[in-house]
Design a protein with these regions (language model features):
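Short coil/turn segments at secondary-structure boundaries
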Residues: 135-137, 151-152, 270-277, 344-350, ...
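Surface-exposed loop-to-helix/strand elements on domain peripheries
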Residues: 109-114, 303-419
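Extended hydrophobic-aromatic, low-complexity segments
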Residues: 49, 323-324, 343-346, 418-419, ...
Length: 504
């Protein structure tokens, strides 16, 4: 099997086991120790991580070790086949996790209404957050980590929510990292961002360092700029796919390399069978005769007494059935390591119901893995949300706090939509806050926006008060035996109903 440790600009000295955390015992970074911490401790670790990240990214793009495959015998027949399953699994999970945009909804403990949250969601949508989330998920799945940076937009004109005072970006993880304190809590103490000036020489990058209150620029090993900033927190947040910062297909790389080698050898076997070696027995053939065979496809031989002349071929055909059995076994290992569902084969053409298909084809394992990724994403997204809200409070007068917002990542669009509609219809009729009916079933991609759009109808039906809030239990309109709101009946209707009841 080809060695996969070699990468552009360096070597991976160990098997890939996730990215290394960058930690320091320092509790803060300032002008006095910024060079010592960043250049002396953080950059060497980041260089190792960067080599691995670039290898994984190139692997995802199709630059895989089988392309450097060589053969000692029959070197003229050397096929190099890349079955890019790394691209397959990353593309699948990217769509599965970010196909429906991340949404913000009002939390149960929020004191205000959800209108301001809806304005925030719309404003971020105008800023392209959905596309940035997709890019962020791709980096997380490729190399186990991604970054989101949020800074005040210097071009903001005060027209929130038509425009936002937020400058949101997703830098490449090989050009950014977070420095953590190595003590209890592993608190982040600094952000480092590389600004490339010469893509052929990483050593010429401008290094930007953010602390909660200061900003530094390091150029050629010297601090060339130092100033304070008013944000009061770190602007960049690290998103980890898992605690080890290991990419989705990273554990399966040996299996993926073996699949590429097997497929390449299978094609070599077919080519060698077709282009088999000719053996001439009891006859002499010169180069001109061989050229004539290639041109005409036939030749004439003469036999002598006791020495019959013959021509045969040395051809050993590869057993394709055994090769396919081995390939299927390795594909099953790949699917197990990446929790990929089975989407091919005749086994899918059955009359099973949705639940049976989900379990049989591995979608339950996919959903369990996705739930782990979602929990890690929400943890980091809440930190990014705190930075966004801090900037909005300082520039746009927003009163939102991070505790007022719940983060939703809608998924499982293969579920039965009719069941979701039935759950929604049942919940909306119960004496509960109507917003729970919008957020619980997973029917709406943006539950908060759907709830805000439905408010006039909920008010008209008595589910919400005139102020747009759920009435208190004692204020809930009473229902008669037929389920009709008695509070909505006129005096005459109420009197007629009472007389009819007395007559009965």
């Amino acid at each position: 099997m080809a060695e996969y440790q070699m990468v552009v600009g360096g070597f991976l000295n160990e098997p890939l086991t996730g990215r290394r955390p960058i930690e320091t015992p320092e509790t803060e970074i300032n002008r006095a120790n910024v060079l010592k911490v960043v250049m002396g401790k953080a950059e060497p670790i980041h260089l190792l991580n960067k080599n691995e990240i670039r290898f994984l990214h190139n692997y995802y793009l199709g630059s895989q070790p089988v392309l450097q495959r060589t053969k000692e015998y029959h070197a003229e027949i050397t096929n190099r086949i890349v079955e890019n399953h790394a691209n397959e699994c990353v593309g699948f999970y990217t769509g599965y996790m970010s196909g429906t945009p991340c949404s913000y909804v009002r939390s149960e403990t929020a004191t205000g209404d959800g209108e301001e949250i809806a304005r925030l969601s719309n404003a971020l949508q105008y800023e392209g957050k959905d596309a940035l989330d997709r890019r962020l998920w791709q980096w997380m799945l490729e190399c186990g980590q991604g970054y989101r940076i949020v800074l005040p937009d210097k071009g903001y004109n005060g027209n929130y929510p038509d425009e936002t005072p937020l400058l949101v970006d997703v830098p490449d993880p090989d050009m950014a990292y977070v420095i953590y304190n190595s003590g209890i809590g592993h608190k982040p103490i600094a952000n480092v961002l590389h600004i490339p000036r010469n893509y052929q020489n990483d050593l010429n990058d401008l290094i930007c360092v953010y602390t909660p209150n200061q900003y530094f620029e390091i150029d050629n090993g010297k601090v060339t700029k130092s100033e304070n900033h008013s944000l009061g927190m770190l602007p960049m947040v690290e998103y980890k796919l898992n605690p080890e910062r290991m990419g989705l297909f990273e554990p399966a790389i040996p299996v993926l390399d073996a699949i590429n080698d097997l497929e390449s050898n299978r094609l070599d076997g077919v080519a060698q069978f077709i282009q088999s070696i000719m053996v001439f027995t009891n006859c002499l053939v010169d180069k001109d005769a061989l050229d004539q065979v290639k041109e005409l496809g036939a030749m004439c031989l003469k036999s002598t007494s006791g020495l019959p002349a013959s021509v045969s071929q040395i051809a050993n055909e590869l057993d394709q059935q055994q090769s396919q059995t081995l390939l299927d076994s390795m594909l099953n290992v790949y699917r197990s390591l990446t929790a990929m569902p089975s989407t091919t084969g005749s086994e899918n053409a059955t009359s099973d119901n949705v639940g049976a298909v989900i379990v049989r084809n591995g979608w339950n394992h996919t959903e369990a893995r996705a739930q782990q990724y979602e929990n890690m994403f929400k943890y980091a997204e809440r930190q990014s949300l705190s930075v966004m809200l801090k900037i909005l409070r300082d520039t746009a007068g927003s009163k939102l706090m991070a505790s007022d917002i719940n983060i939703k990542l809608p998924r499982r669009q293969y579920d039965n939509q009719q069941s979701k509609v039935q759950i929604f219809a049942q919940m909306i009729q119960q004496p509960i806050d109507p917003q729970l009916a919008f957020t619980t079933p997973g029917l709406f991609p943006d539950p908060q926006a759907a709830y805000e759009m439905s408010k006039p109808f909920l008010i008209a039906s008595g589910k919400l008060g005139e102020d747009g809030k759920a009435p208190k239990p004692q204020e809930q309109p009473k229902q008669d035996a037929t389920g009709t709101n008695a509070g909505n009946m006129t005096d005459k209707q109420s009197t007629d109903t009472n007389k009819e009841t007395e007559g009965k």
